[in-house]
UniProtKB/Swiss-Prot annotation:
Chain positions with N6-succinyllysine modification: K69, K260, K302, K415, K418
Coiled coil: none
Family matches, as InterPro entries: Aminotrans_3, Aminotrans_3_PPA_site, PyrdxlP-dep_Trfase, PyrdxlP-dep_Trfase_major, PyrdxlP-dep_Trfase_small
Keyword hit for Transit peptide: yes
EC number: 2.6.1.44, 2.6.1.40, 2.6.1.18
Protein name: Alanine--glyoxylate aminotransferase 2, mitochondrial
GO biological process: glycine biosynthetic process, by transamination of glyoxylate; glyoxylate catabolic process; L-alanine catabolic process, by transamination; N(omega),N(omega)-dimethyl-L-arginine catabolic process; positive regulation of nitric oxide biosynthetic process
Organism per entry: Rattus norvegicus
UniProt keyword Acetylation, yes or no: yes
Amino acid sequence: MSLAWRTLQKAFYLETSLRILQMRPSLSCASRIYVPKLTLHTKHNMPPCDFSPEKYQSLAYNHVLEIHKQHLSPVNTAYFQKPLLLHQGHMEWLFDSEGNRYLDFFSGIVTVGVGHCHPKVTAVAKKQMDRLWHTSSVFFHSPMHEYAERLSALLPEPLKVIFLVNSGSEANDLAMVMARAYSNHTDIISFRGAYHGCSPYTLGLTNVGIYKMKVPSTIACQSTMCPDVFRGPWGGSHCRDSPVQTVRKCSCAPDGCQAKERYIEQFKDTLNTSVATSIAGFFAEPIQGVNGVVQYPKEFLKEAFALVRERGGVCIADEVQTGFGRLGSHFWGFQTHDTMPDIVTMAKGIGNGFPMAAVVTTPEIASSLAKHLHHFSTFGGSPLACAIGSAVLEVIEEENLQRNSQEVGTYMLLKFAKLRDEFDIVGDVRGKGLMVGIEMVQDKISRQPLPKTEVNQIHEDCKDMGLLVGRGGNFSQTFRIAPPMRVTKLEVDFAFEVFRSALTQHMERRAK
């Protein structure tokens, strides 16, 4: 597309949005979303979509609310004052029960990597459902072995032995057992701000306040300082493996990083004071997801892994959110840190929303587990899950989604970084590939989190304009952006304009 045509197209979108004061949502994908309570300049034309959803003919909205209140656990909370009742999905689009269309920039919590209801994945699932759903792993079936061969080919030596399970929590739970069985030690370390699951075992690894219980959830899990170069005590303008750095000043030499060295000293302090002289392991997300897309200084994980191994521990990379090409430059997040874990856990994007997860390790660690217990999962590695998993890997390769994550992700990061320059309440824009965090602050000097009520309103405004993003951070102060990996630059442009309008609207409210 030529520059002149792009300019003409942008002018057309602007002219269209100014002419349309209010449009009722219809069931056609060509319709524009109705935007209540927002000023005219905040309305933006959605990118085109050639899919029309089915007419919603299920439960009335109020009936859904009543069922949710009476019969679903109160821990099942939803975004927004009026939660969305979603009806259908197509690639990067979601449709609610009223026919409104939304651009999904959170992918079901960083899960729907190849797009909602991708036709190839759907066709494979239907074909396998007609053939064989479930046997349990006490019988052989080709989908499991085909998938194991495909997945192992994407991992470096010696990470070649695969345990198939059903969720990220279950995968990390098993990884904890593996680490303790192999090392014959107990203590496991994880970062503050880490999220590794909500099972009774993994709750000890998870260090985000709202997920912690008032009673002991597990033993021998210790936290260490998260090397957060924006919110932490140290950080500069060259720390991150990202096209966008923090606004903090940096006096480091070109070949050094003072922030990294200081965070390593904190890690050593944890090893020297909070755990036994020999430990079982260390868990790390290559980029923290739930904590708001937090990146560490370059080389930190590499040095931390070496220190852990000196204590007899194994190193576990939690790739539940970062794996399968989402970060763009590499297929796995640990590869971006130039390091090699002993165990890798994965879920979410592995099945594009179908319940599936895996733990991958070395033959030596796998053998040690077999000597300690007979591990078994009734549903892990089912024919249906494995067929879907193979289809997801094929789509990622055939559609060059890792390359798209790199190209469009870099474009998105650089574009959203402009908001940090324009708005004082945007403290940081960070990330890699199609995993981006936008941290909201009261001001850039104090870096104090923007109050949750204000972040909520910005979130609501984005939704009202047809954009769905996630939330993260210990104070829910960070917007998490992780669209399906097939997202286009045109869709990024729309998301940027919506987000910018939501921020402008917020500043107007503040000024009143």
